[in-house]
């Protein structure tokens, strides 16, 4: 009798073992820790991102010659759109930040394991690690970043994330989904590189072996605040350019044109509009994300 030579079908137990093995992989753990930390920080600081976007896109005719501050925009949003209006754009923010932060930390962990092999990074290595990891995450999440920016601006009435993706693709093509990508990378990659450098260097100054274990998260958070402020100041102009290119891709088609038009309409000050809410949000988000990430990685027995 001829025996059936076909391989046996994969059993449910085998599938379960494979999934369990994947979940135990350090890179997957780093991705999960990063995703959870990104969720926490996004929920808390979304209003600051919305205020930043509104401040950056105010037209001179909207307020005459008067300078509009963050508090005035905050009160206007609450008055016209309710308190929950401050969380407009939350869905694309979550869709962007949760996997985006996970991709960032997962890539960062992989690069550190491959290139550093256990030794602490130098200042230059920290910059390169941050730039590389953020670039990967930025390219992957660019379409969601475009949608998030348009939601927050209040100038687009998309019904859902899927509807927004379909509308942008039909009206602007695939380029519309990646509008402002160069400006985004010029903003995010240097921010992550500069942030990681200052964060690691500041942590190296602090004698962690002499700090009470319960105070280590607070110490790490403080280091993150310091690093975030410096990185935010350096990358603010790129953020303004990115916002305009994503909201008005037909008007701002390339970076040089965007720089010229923003300077013409707003002057040098235009490149720093929305700087305060952005610095607050980016600094607090990065500090919280890194603190939560490092604590979770330590609980899993992994070195972050």
From Swiss-Prot:
State the reactions this protein catalyses: glycine(in) = glycine(out)
Q: What is its main location?
A: mitochondrion
Question: Could you tell me the membrane topology recorded for this protein?
Answer: Multi-pass membrane protein
> In which tissues is this gene expressed?
Preferentially expressed in erythroid cells.
Q: What induces it?
A: Up-regulated in the brains of patients with Alzheimer's disease.
Q: Where in the cell is it found?
A: Mitochondrion inner membrane
Transmembrane spans: 31-56, 89-115, 127-152, 180-203, 219-245, 274-292
Provide the disease association from the record.
Anemia, sideroblastic, 2, pyridoxine-refractory: A form of sideroblastic anemia not responsive to pyridoxine. Sideroblastic anemia is characterized by anemia of varying severity, hypochromic peripheral erythrocytes, systemic iron overload secondary to chronic ineffective erythropoiesis, and the presence of bone marrow ringed sideroblasts. Sideroblasts are characterized by iron-loaded mitochondria clustered around the nucleus.
Known function: Mitochondrial glycine transporter that imports glycine into the mitochondrial matrix. Plays an important role in providing glycine for the first enzymatic step in heme biosynthesis, the condensation of glycine with succinyl-CoA to produce 5-aminolevulinate (ALA) in the mitochondrial matrix. Required during erythropoiesis.
Q: What is this protein called?
A: Mitochondrial glycine transporter
Q: Which organism is it from?
A: Homo sapiens (Human)
